[in-house]
Every structure is written in structure tokens, then in C-alpha cells.
Regions:
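Perimembrane loop-to-helix junctions flanking transmembrane segments
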Residues: 39-55
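Extended, low-polarity transmembrane helix blocks
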Residues: 1-37, 53-65, 69, 76-136
Length: 136
């Protein structure tokens, strides 16, 4: 593959990684701005499921921080493999929660996130425009 095509593919990977990072970051920031409101909303959403309230509450306080950290790492391209793994695990937890709620529309959206985390993980060798690459 010629250098120009390789650079174009690496740039496309960067844009996808950056977009996922911004998405995760803004989700985290939005929830952290009113964490108690998010906590109460989550408790209400899971009130008819088998999950105990303390577990829902604990999750609602942890998820925004996880989203924020994963987002920052993806934006910077720092510890990208680990950030992608954590992001995929977070999405798995969210899919589980959506399944318990029988919220198939939200689960469909989360499955799309899962596919993007897979693509970014599978094609990690294209992660040229990143702090990880500068650290090599």
C-alpha cells in the first residue's frame, strides 16, 4: 500500500477514535454537571428491575467518571488499547442494564457503540496520530 493511502486510512482511524472520545467525554461531562439528578434518574429507570437500588446508585456515580476518563484517553490517543477495552466493557454493562429494562431501542444504540469499539480495537495498528505513537 502506498504511503498516501496508508496515511488516509490512519487519518480515518484518528477521526473515528476522536469522535468516539468526544462522545464518551461529553456524556461524562453532561452527567457530572448534575450527578445527583443523574443518580435519581437512574434509580427511577431501574426501579422495576431486579437490580437493588444501592447497585444502581453506585453505578450511576461511577459511569460518568468512566465515560470522562475513557473519552479523554481516546481523544489523546493515550493508552488507547486499554481505553477501548474499558469502553467496550462499559458498553457491555450498559447493554446488560438496557436488557433488564427491556429497552431495546437504547440497546440497539449501545450495540452500535460496541461495533465501533470493536473496529477501533481490531484496527489498533492504524493508531498513528496519537500520544501512544509518540511514546514509542
Amino acid at each position: 500500500m502506498n504511503d498516501s493511502k496508508q496515511t488516509t486510512i490512519q487519518l480515518a482511524y484518528f477521526i473515528l477514535r476522536l469522535t468516539m472520545g468526544v462522545n464518551m467525554f461529553t456524556n461524562g461531562v453532561a452527567r457530572l454537571l448534575d450527578l445527583e439528578k443523574f443518580n435519581m434518574w437512574m434509580i427511577g429507570q431501574f426501579s422495576d428491575t431486579i437490580l437493588p437500588e444501592f447497585l444502581v446508585s453506585l453505578s450511576s456515580y461511577m459511569i460518568p467518571f468512566a465515560e470522562l476518563i475513557i473519552g479523554v484517553l481516546l481523544i489523546l490517543g493515550l493508552f488507547t488499547s486499554r481505553a477501548l477495552l474499558l469502553g467496550a466493557l462499559l458498553i457491555t454493562v450498559l447493554v446488560f442494564g438496557s436488557g433488564l429494562q427491556e429497552n431495546w431501542n437504547v440497546m440497539s444504540s449501545q450495540m452500535i457503540y460496541s461495533v465501533f469499539f470493536f473496529i477501533l480495537s481490531y484496527m489498533i495498528e492504524l493508531n498513528k496520530f496519537s500520544l501512544d505513537n509518540l511514546r514509542k
